[in-house]
Amino acid sequence: MRLRDVIPAALTLTCLPAVTASPAYVDKQRPREVKKRDSPVLAGYNADPNIAVFGNTYYIYPTTDGFPDWGGQTFYWWKSTDLATWTRSAEPFLTLNGSSGNVPWATGNAWAPTIIERYGKYYFYFSGQNPTYNRKTIGVAVANSPEGPFTAQSKAMILNNEALTSGQAIDSAAFLDPETNKYYLYWGNGSPLLAELSDDMLSIKTSTLQAPTGLTDFREGSFMIYRQGVYHMTYSIDDTRSEDYRVGYATGPSATGPFTYRGVILQKDASKGILATGHNSIVNVPGTDDWYIAYHRFAIPNGNGTMRETTIDRLYFDDEGLIVPVVPTLESVAPLGS
């Protein structure tokens, strides 16, 4: 049974009815909108946000949260033109429910996706429970638009039985290296892994599979950006059920490292009720040096490791080109251009 969306009182919402439904339920009502600038920026329980920009539109692809044992089965997209007002897709674009869904190999645990564009196609990587192997595996779905429709491949592409393995094959993050024009996928739980993506983006080049070094206290949630000749890797430390879940940071001379640990750049502020700040992604406003970080935290109030909400804050660099520790806020960010 799907849990009812919980809408924090700080939000002003329109057309946002609470619903209780089975995982197969398809919400055909018109898209949801968040009108107010206060956080969270996405209504209800959403975690592991992957923020991206395509053209003039920003997208967040999150884990649909609020289920025991992170048992959500659906992926939705959210979109915005100003990073403050977000509209959700009226229907899930992927449902991980075996033959009742549209991802043949997966039965639930729709977790931590990432998306990237290549040659006009959009590749959406995600993890799910794979009953064939009785573990989490990573798959890919393809579309001609960031809003879909997406077609999932019939089998998972990373099975966690490769030459190098991690605790779980989860938390993928796709990255285009602007220096080499190579496409990479990062993933892992307990130990980080990366590999170059194949030319068709549907598998990894197994000869490039490696475990990057220098990611002190790595737990999960890798994310890579590039700025002014430096590769910036962020990742999550501790357990998502812990209020001390936080974001670690390392830099390197290439997309594969070696990386130098730079410390923690995002952590809780208990004085504000902000706890378990982790599993981030980062986006640059095209044509500027303005950067933003999306991440989840325990829902306020009374959230926990399966009741998480997504917010956005500004991200800055110092004079040496390193990320400055992020100040988590309850206000989130002003609309772009305001």
Language-model features: locations:
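Carbohydrate-active catalytic/glycan-binding domains of CAZyme proteins
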Residues: S22-S338
